[in-house]
Design a protein with these regions (language model features):
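Charged, amphipathic alpha-helical regulatory modules used
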Residues: 1-106, 696-701, 706
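Short, conserved micro-motifs enriched in small and acidic residues
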Residues: 13-14, 495-499
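Amphipathic, well-packed alpha-helical segments that form the structural scaffold of globular domains
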Residues: 24, 47, 451, 455, ...
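Solvent-exposed, amphipathic alpha-helical segments
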Residues: 45, 49-52, 426-432, 511
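A structural signal for well-ordered alpha-helices, especially hydrophobic packing surfaces
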Residues: 75, 93, 279, 454, ...
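Conserved catalytic cores of very large enzyme subunits
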Residues: 99-494, 515-517, 521-676, 682, ...
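Contiguous, well-ordered alpha-helical segments that form the cores/surfaces of helical PPI scaffolds
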Residues: 225, 498-511, 529
Length: 706
């Protein structure tokens, strides 16, 4: 009888059933289930190899090697899982030590990686510590050695590593579908609202609950159209109530209309308080976006204007009001509705009034040039941004990635993204030069690394159960989302996108020929075209909806500089500042006009259809006509446009002014300052401190044309 010598020196009889137990555990960790035939093969392989050794005693190390050999022939993914788990005690000690060190920093210093989080709060600290553990687990059990090395060196960056194992990224959530006919949430049945005020309450609950089950931006598209039927119900109920009190029909309609307007204002105010003060189970304030602007009905118009007016007036004590950050507002601009003399020009004017005082709404062109407008012009379909800048590729109702026929139409609402991985282009270029290799050859290597990560992510998430996010997968929030709680979500993932991010195109151009994007940009354009061509081939070969994403580098803008310096040192205009440029944006220090910036960045616009935003810093003090002119110009060019001002509010006397560091009225430095982080706004100063990291603060300090 053959005996196995264990690590502690004890011996026990060889039992192939113990091999079955071990490989099944490894398969479970890899989300794989072996068939009986596969298990029989493994058992026969191991038994045969052990007998061929012609030994009475076999070390556990030799046994592991034999089992690995069997698994490599059966399922390499499980073989990796088995191999990774072998030395788990040593690895886990090291991993937990890293988590402990980071946890001490979080507990006593804080963390500014994500400006949506207030790391002073206990709930946030706990969440951040859990995130550190989750990052380590992701690297240990999901990533290959090559991927880990590429990340540590800085050639690629896996966004939201702490959450990718569990759920999806950003989405266009179908609130309307969830509300229709009622739904279940938290084991309670919610009837469909019968009045506008109840609709606001329920929508707030849906958004906070569903947004907590994902990690990216959560967009409610066309909020005015969602609220419109509930406003109509409130209006009719109001007329009936007032007529019952003896008022004439005309007077009853007048009073009912006033009530609906008040409900809109109170409802949007309630959402603003809820979304900016109630943190999610993730420890952050969910990044919620609401889009509006195309509704032409009386209550749709009222909804949009009320939303904008509530934001413009701000929240807080009388005399100390300031705009909130969430939800981010996006105005859906149609020149045939919002142009001079058109049906919704008054809605457009309300948007301009709001933007010039609060920076929001951002503006999305539906009738200009390019991909987003083409979907609206041809199909009447709006592609609202997911979160701050992500956009979906078309998914057709019948044909999927391609239209089945001329009548087939794309679907956007109810879809989502499964994650982004970004290329650090200056580092990849520097590596190619240092090693004497063709740039495209080195770039291809990292593109394929990202491709493989995405493929495994689709496979991994596909094994998740619908119960992990019931509002999305069971109650209709996502396309195809009427699954049973025990169903796997794999069918829903077909229409999901996965993003290849790009950062620091300006620094890439500088590294190539010592010129900025404002001075040249041709090499950066050529590189971005090449990436698009490669990713398009990946889409055809893999059948996955890959997208090119202009990365909003928040914490990453500083991390990439450190990574570059470690490998290639300090290079002028590449790594000599504390930050790199976001995506295809001109460097923030460029002394260019808003119009010049629009034109320079417009060259890259249609090459980043998976995520993009254009914004300019307005060197003007609440100048309505100037803002209107630049917004209309951006809309003609087909942009998704942000208005950049540097808002500042004195928390002591209530004075507000642009670009203020010390209050000129009372001399206080106790200010709240709001700046654009990337595609969204954030507090660059709250009660003397900031939620932003040092690199981003350094960038903000140098902004001229951002």
């Amino acid at each position: 009888m053959i005996k196995v010598i264990k690590k502690d020196g004890t011996k026990e009889e060889f039992n192939v059933q113990k091999v079955v137990v071990a490989v099944n555990k490894s398969a479970y960790r890899a989300l794989v289930t072996f068939t009986e035939e596969e298990l029989d093969f493994i058992c026969n392989f191991v038994t045969e190899k052990v007998e061929q050794m012609r030994k009475k005693e076999v070390t556990i190390s030799d046994m592991h090697n034999v089992v690995e050999g069997a698994l490599e022939q059966t399922n390499p993914l499980v073989a990796k899982s088995y191999r990774d788990y072998r030395n788990y005690k040593q690895d886990f000690v090291q991993m937990l030590d890293e988590v402990y060190k980071k946890s001490q920093s979080i507990m006593y210093i804080g963390d500014k990686e994500n400006s949506n989080t207030d790391s002073a709060l206990v709930s946030t600290k706990r969440s951040l510590i859990f995130n550190e553990l989750n990052k380590e687990l992701y690297q240990k059990f999901f990533m290959t050695t090559e991927e880990i090395q590429a990340c540590r060196d800085g050639y690629i960056y896996i966004h939201d590593m702490s959450a990718r194992r569990d759920t999806i990224n950003c989405c266009l959530f179908n609130v309307q579908e969830v509300l229709k006919g009622g739904f279940e949430m938290g084991n309670l049945w919610y009837n469909e609202p019968k009045t506008l005020d109840v609709a606001f309450d329920v929508i707030g609950d849906i958004v906070l609950s569903a947004a907590s089950q994902q990690y990216g931006g959560f967009t409610v598209p066309n909020i005015e159209l969602i609220l419109e039927p509930y406003a109509e119900k409130s209006y009719e109920a109001g007329i009936e109530r007032y007529e019952g009190l003896g008022l004439s029909r005309e007077r009853a309609e007048e009073e009912a209309m006033k009530d609906v307007k008040r409900e809109f204002e109170q409802g949007f105010q309630g959402l603003e308080y809820k979304f900016n003060s109630v943190s999610s189970s993730r420890g952050d304030y969910p990044f919620i976006t609401m889009t509006a602007g195309t509704g032409t009905g009386r209550f749709a118009k009222m909804a949009t204007i009320s939303m904008l007016d509530v934001r413009r007036r701000g929240q807080g004590k009388e005399g100390h009001k300031k705009p909130v950050l969430f939800p981010k507002l996006v105005f859906l601009y149609d020149k045939n509705l919002h142009g001079a003399g058109c049906e919704l020009e008054d809605v457009f004017e309300a948007g301009i009034r709001c933007s010039r005082q609060t920076m929001y709404p951002d503006w999305l062109s539906l009738t200009g040039e390019g991909y987003i407008a083409s979907m609206y012009k041809k199909y009447g379909k709006i592609i609202s941004p997911m979160g701050c800048r992500a956009f979906l590729s078309p998914w057709y109702k019948e044909g999927g990635m391609k239209p089945a026929d001329e009548k087939d139409e794309p679907i956007f609402v109810g879809r989502f993204n499964i994650g982004a991985v970004s290329l650090h282009l200056p580092m990849i270029y520097a590596k190619s030069k240092q090693e004497g290799k063709d740039f495209h050859e080195v770039l291809d290597y990292y593109l394929n690394l990202i491709r493989e990560l995405h493929i495994r992510t689709y496979e991994y998430l596909g094994e998740m159960k619908a119960s992990t996010n019931p509002l999305a997968y069971c109650e209709g929030g996502f396309l195809g989302g009427h699954l049973g709680i025990h169903d796997k979500i794999k069918p829903i993932l077909k229409s999901a996108t996965a993003s290849f991010g790009i950062t620091a195109l300006n620094e890439l151009q500088q590294l190539y020929n010592h010129k900025s994007l404002a001075e040249d940009g041709e090499f950066a354009l050529e590189t971005l075209r090449y990436i698009n061509e490669q990713v398009e081939e990946f889409k055809k070969e893999d059948g996955n909806l890959y997208a090119i994403y202009g990365t909003p580098a928040e914490n990453l803008c500083g991390l990439q500089v450190k990574q570059f310096r470690k490998k290639y040192g300090v290079i002028e205009n590449v790594s000599d500042r504390e930050y790199v440029s976001n995506s295809f944006h001109c460097h923030v220090t460029e002394d260019i006009t808003p119009i010049e910036k629009q034109d320079l960045e417009g060259r890259f616009w249609e090459l980043c259809n998976g995520g993009k935003i254009q914004y300019v810093k307005y060197p003007i003090n609440y100048n309505k006509e100037a803002v209107k002119t630049l917004v209309r110009r951006a809309m003609d060019k087909g942009f998704y446009e942000g208005v950049n001002l540097s808002l500042a509010y004195c928390d002591d006397c209530g004075h507000e002014e642009l670009e203020m560091d010390v209050c000129p009225v009372c001399g206080s430095k106790n200010l709240t300052k709001i700046d654009r982080m990337n595609g969204y706004l954030s507090y660059s100063r709250v009660k003397g401190d900031t939620r932003l990291n040092d690199a981003k603060m350094a960038e903000i300090a140098e902004r001229k044309s951002m």
